[in-house]
Amino acid sequence: MAARMRFFRKIMSAGVALDAKSDELTPADLGSVDELALYIVFGPGTSAGSVQVESAHVSGYTGVWAPEGSPVAWAAASRVHKVSIAGASFVTRARLSVAIVGGSVDIYAVGNG
């Protein structure tokens, strides 16, 4: 049986600043998904930056979140990167681990189940 898309939404718009955080994906979003895909879109004019996908045990956690893989580093302007996470995560977000230079980044989330 083919996976069905459970949701698609933009979780960060025009991110630039170091440590800027996306909207959180919570159990309400992730409860019915088997796979989460994040599309990280470095905009035109960008020349540097990095995005770290992270998870935590509760929404709004103020400590250091657990990294989900390595940071996604800028490679080219107007380029899309995809990060896929299989299995359960309670709360997930993206954080700019290196400020975006020369433009901004948008991040979209897709939940499949």
What positions do the PLM features span?
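Transition segment at domain starts
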Residues: 1-33
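Exposed aromatic-hydrophobic patches
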Residues: 23-28, 78-86
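Noncatalytic modules at the cell exterior or secretory-pathway interfaces
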Residues: 33-40, 85-103
